[in-house]
């Protein structure tokens, strides 16, 4: 395919039938695409920590992080499909994820298990705040379906945060 053909295809309108206006499609699909980048970044960080956790609570943390990683990954396809369903375009590459993600990577050679859990807890809290902002945007544009999906993802992220908090909480005093 020629460069000119690629440029022409990029300019082609989707014209997906939806009850949302052009501004709503632009705003919501843009916000959901950034959320999707965050979800992929959080998924990989969660799996990174799942693979590299060690210590006396290895089994519990390893299984917890595996479960949480699966849950995060399970949300990625519905997010991307929602963007497409309303007439937008979404992520196309790892490079695009890297440019848009707000969740910070952790490439450290060693991270203590409690630091792993605390970092993921904070990342999930950040994700919840971003999802609430996107929910408000959906409400402003009357996109009930996207708002409804976000409510479920917020609930899942709150549960992940709760588990991570409880796993790092010190007992006593």
Stretches found by the model and what they are:
Residues 53, 57-96:
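Conserved alpha-helical segments that form or flank metal/cofactor-binding pockets of metalloenzymes
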Residues 2-3, 58, 70, 94-98, ...:
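Long, contiguous binding/interaction regions
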Residues 75-80, 160-168:
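Amphipathic alpha-helical coiled-coil segments
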């Amino acid at each position: 395919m020629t460069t000119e053909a690629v440029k022409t295809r990029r300019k082609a309108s989707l014209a997906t039938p939806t009850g949302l206006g052009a501004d709503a499609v632009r705003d919501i699909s843009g916000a959901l695409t950034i959320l999707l980048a965050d979800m992929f970044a959080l998924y990989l960080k969660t799996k990174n920590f799942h693979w590299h956790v060690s210590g006396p609570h290895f089994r519990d943390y390893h299984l917890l992080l595996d479960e949480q990683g699966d849950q995060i990954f399970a949300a990625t396809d519905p997010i991307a499909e929602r963007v497409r369903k309303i007439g937008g375009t979404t992520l196309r590459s790892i490079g695009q994820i890297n440019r848009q993600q707000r969740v910070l990577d952790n490439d450290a050679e060693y991270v203590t298990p409690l630091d792993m859990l605390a970092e993921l807890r904070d990342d999930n809290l950040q994700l919840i705040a971003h999802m609430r902002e996107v929910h408000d945007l959906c409400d402003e544009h009357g996109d009930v379906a996207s708002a409804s999906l976000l409510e479920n993802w917020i609930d899942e992220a709150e549960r992940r945060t709760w588990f991570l908090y409880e796993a790092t909480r010190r007992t006593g005093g």
